[in-house]
Amino acid sequence: MLKVSALLCVCAAAWCSQTLAAAAAVAVAGGRSDGGNFLDEKQWLTTISQYDKEVGQWNKFRDEVEDDYFRTWNPGKPFDQALDPAKDPCLKTKCSRHKVCITQDAQTALCISHRRLTHSMKEVGGSHKQWRGLPSSTCKPCPIAYASPVCGSDGHSYSSQCKLEYQACVLGKQISIKCEGRCPCPSDKSMNIGRNVKRACSDLEFREVANRLRDWFKALHESGSQNKKTKALLRPERSRFDTSILPICKDSLGWMFNRLDTNYDLLLDQSELGSIYLDKNEQCTKAFFNSCDTYKDSLISNNEWCYCFQRQQDPPCHTELSNIQKRQGIKKLLGQYIPLCDEDGYYKPTQCHGSVGQCWCVDRYGNEVVGSRINGVADCAIDFEISGDFASGDFREWTDDEGEEDDIMNDKDDIEDDDEDEGDDDDDGDVHDGYI
């Protein structure tokens, strides 16, 4: 009896082993416990990164869904081979460095950022993750067509109007077309200038270029602040450009400089400046950046960057007076510091605050000369131009080591540094031809 029982146990064990082996073979052959959803497997999530390769560099200022967000395989392949449902379209798709390829269906490959992919997963128990679906499932995808780039109101370039509308749908915000072509939008005058016609640019045209670039940087800065949470910069603190020492660079200009300065040396070389797209028709844009390079060393320092834009602003003293009048309205506030302007709208060398009885010396752009503030009338016989006018060939070199903020600041509150926002989308920029 015991022998019969033992024999039955051995047979039962063998039958169970064969059954499990057969079930495993069926599963390997194509049977799936997840209902066919390949994204439910953790193994897939670790292997899709093999498609995350890109030849060359990626423009850091492009949106995640724009510029061929829906990628396709090589159109030179035979038609029947390209549409073979047995082949993974991601095998023939190259995504940017910070994106991965996923298969939307048998014929559509989709490049999506790591961040969006992570946000589309939710924890279900332990370490198992369940796919919730693409964030753009309700947004209409764009057909494959020739690129017709447009510049969006968020400061980003899109390969077509459809890509712009798709981006707006994915992000759930309003994005309109600012102009045809890539950002920044050219002026009306530059559209009528031939490609091969060389001419000198006027001061007015330089000012228009600076204003357009400043508006573009502001749109990028605000767009980045709205889309991402602020994160601390992973860079040496002493290598960062302290924008508080130069008020003109405390906002978007300083933010853009830190974005472009990828090696943190406080100098922009040709490869770093190449991240800014230049319209071939806008000859004055190239000339503008050439004018910023005071030392003619093919490098733009943080000082040169800030003062180059500062020179192209409206007369600073008149601008400050207008701002004061707008803030206080009809009533004049007691104790308010009122700057003294010359006939051209720039600051006079001697500035005084009658309420506190102090005077100090400034350059024509209103930057205070360190150590010149005294009680009483200051001796500012020299026309200071060192910090704003590089034409003099001399200027004061600011460094991050100098903690002279209390002496530099006027009778105003301290200016707080803007939060830097260089999160997950700090991709490598496309390298264009240098223009210096």
Swiss-Prot record:
<protein>
    <recommendedName>
        <fullName>Testican-3</fullName>
    </recommendedName>
</protein>
<feature type="disulfide bond">
    <location>
        <begin position="317"/>
        <end position="341"/>
    </location>
</feature>
<keyword id="KW-0106">Calcium</keyword>
<dbReference type="GO" id="GO:0030414">
    <property type="term" value="F:peptidase inhibitor activity"/>
</dbReference>
<feature type="region of interest" description="Disordered">
    <location>
        <begin position="393"/>
        <end position="436"/>
    </location>
</feature>
<keyword id="KW-0654">Proteoglycan</keyword>
<dbReference type="InterPro" id="IPR036058">
    <property type="entry name" value="Kazal_dom_sf"/>
</dbReference>
<keyword id="KW-0964">Secreted</keyword>
<feature type="domain" description="Thyroglobulin type-1">
    <location>
        <begin position="314"/>
        <end position="380"/>
    </location>
</feature>
<feature type="domain" description="Kazal-like">
    <location>
        <begin position="133"/>
        <end position="185"/>
    </location>
</feature>
<keyword id="KW-1015">Disulfide bond</keyword>
<feature type="disulfide bond">
    <location>
        <begin position="90"/>
        <end position="101"/>
    </location>
</feature>
<feature type="disulfide bond">
    <location>
        <begin position="142"/>
        <end position="162"/>
    </location>
</feature>
<dbReference type="Pfam" id="PF07648">
    <property type="entry name" value="Kazal_2"/>
</dbReference>
<dbReference type="GO" id="GO:0005539">
    <property type="term" value="F:glycosaminoglycan binding"/>
</dbReference>
<keyword id="KW-0732">Signal</keyword>
<keyword id="KW-0646">Protease inhibitor</keyword>
<dbReference type="GO" id="GO:0005509">
    <property type="term" value="F:calcium ion binding"/>
</dbReference>
<dbReference type="InterPro" id="IPR002350">
    <property type="entry name" value="Kazal_dom"/>
</dbReference>
<feature type="disulfide bond">
    <location>
        <begin position="151"/>
        <end position="183"/>
    </location>
</feature>
<feature type="disulfide bond">
    <location>
        <begin position="139"/>
        <end position="169"/>
    </location>
</feature>
<dbReference type="GO" id="GO:0005576">
    <property type="term" value="C:extracellular region"/>
</dbReference>
<dbReference type="InterPro" id="IPR019577">
    <property type="entry name" value="SPARC/Testican_Ca-bd-dom"/>
</dbReference>
<keyword id="KW-0483">Metalloprotease inhibitor</keyword>
<keyword id="KW-0272">Extracellular matrix</keyword>
<feature type="disulfide bond">
    <location>
        <begin position="352"/>
        <end position="359"/>
    </location>
</feature>
<dbReference type="InterPro" id="IPR011992">
    <property type="entry name" value="EF-hand-dom_pair"/>
</dbReference>
<feature type="disulfide bond">
    <location>
        <begin position="361"/>
        <end position="380"/>
    </location>
</feature>
<keyword id="KW-0481">Metalloenzyme inhibitor</keyword>
<feature type="compositionally biased region" description="Acidic residues">
    <location>
        <begin position="399"/>
        <end position="430"/>
    </location>
</feature>
<dbReference type="Pfam" id="PF00086">
    <property type="entry name" value="Thyroglobulin_1"/>
</dbReference>
<comment type="function">
    <text>May participate in diverse steps of neurogenesis. Inhibits the processing of pro-matrix metalloproteinase 2 (MMP-2) by MT1-MMP and MT3-MMP. May interfere with tumor invasion.</text>
</comment>
<feature type="disulfide bond">
    <location>
        <begin position="95"/>
        <end position="111"/>
    </location>
</feature>
<dbReference type="InterPro" id="IPR036857">
    <property type="entry name" value="Thyroglobulin_1_sf"/>
</dbReference>
<feature type="glycosylation site" description="O-linked (Xyl...) (glycosaminoglycan) serine">
    <location>
        <position position="387"/>
    </location>
</feature>
<dbReference type="InterPro" id="IPR000716">
    <property type="entry name" value="Thyroglobulin_1"/>
</dbReference>
<keyword id="KW-0357">Heparan sulfate</keyword>
<dbReference type="Pfam" id="PF10591">
    <property type="entry name" value="SPARC_Ca_bdg"/>
</dbReference>
<feature type="signal peptide">
    <location>
        <begin position="1"/>
        <end position="22"/>
    </location>
</feature>
<feature type="glycosylation site" description="O-linked (Xyl...) (glycosaminoglycan) serine">
    <location>
        <position position="392"/>
    </location>
</feature>
<keyword id="KW-0325">Glycoprotein</keyword>
